[in-house]
Design a protein with these regions (language model features):
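Short hydrophobic/aromatic beta-strand element in the GNAT-like acyltransferase core
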Residues: 40, 107, 119
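A short, aliphatic-rich beta-strand micro-motif
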Residues: 104-111
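Short loop/turn motifs at secondary-structure junctions and domain boundaries
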Residues: 35, 97-102
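Glycine-rich acetyl-CoA-binding "A-motif" of GNAT/NAT acetyltransferases
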Residues: 116
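Regulatory sensory and allosteric helical modules in signal-transduction proteins
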Residues: 46-97
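Short beta-strand-to-loop transition segments that serve as allosteric relay/switch motifs
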Residues: 120-128
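Amphipathic alpha-helical "output/dimerization" segments
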Residues: 130-150
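Intrinsically disordered, low-complexity terminal regulatory regions
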Residues: 1-62, 140, 148-162
Length: 162
């Protein structure tokens, strides 16, 4: 499975000591390259002020560097605590258009239990491209990244007590 192969590569990079931010960028790169119909791929990190902030991404620049929880597909995914697969973004009332070319969007939360760390956001210029296989791949990578966020949080907390 493609998601497993991407996670194996992320495991290797992690064992080699790749910094956390570079692991996020590598995950974005691998996901983006995994499907020619993924036209914009990025990670938005959730901060304590309930704002999503854009992290590493591949694709056209976007004005949506900050997104409030509840706003657009990305903010709604966090507010509703669920992944969202939108086959046709024109049907979404509160859609935030990053590009007029975007036709479909997939948002997968990076979470451990109830704690949401971030999300993977993927846009496509084609309608209804996020089939079960694509969603499964992105979910697998999101699960791996959730573990990385958890390890980072634990390491940072332990370092603060030292």
């Amino acid at each position: 499975m493609l998601g497993d192969r991407i996670c194996e590569e992320l495991d290797r990079l992690s064992r080699e000591g790749t910094p956390f931010e570079a692991l996020l960028a590598a995950a974005v790169e691998r996901l983006h390259a995994s499907n020619p119909k993924f036209h914009w791929t990025g990670i938005y990190e959730l901060f304590p002020d309930n704002v999503l902030r854009l992290g590493p991404f591949i694709g056209a620049a976007t004005d949506h560097v900050f997104i409030a929880v509840g706003q657009g597909v990305c903010g709604t995914a966090v507010a509703e605590r669920r992944n969202i697969n939108v086959p046709d973004v024109s049907k979404v009332a509160n859609y935030l258009a990053c590009s007029t070319s975007t036709k479909a969007e997939l948002v997968v939360l990076i979470r451990k239990g109830e704690r949401i760390f971030a999300q993977i956001d993927i846009d496509s210029h084609e309608y209804a491209v996020f089939d079960a296989e694509a969603v499964s791949c992105v979910e697998r990578v999101a699960d791996w990244l959730a573990g990385a966020y958890e390890r980072r949080r634990t390491t940072v907390s332990a370092a603060g007590r030292a």
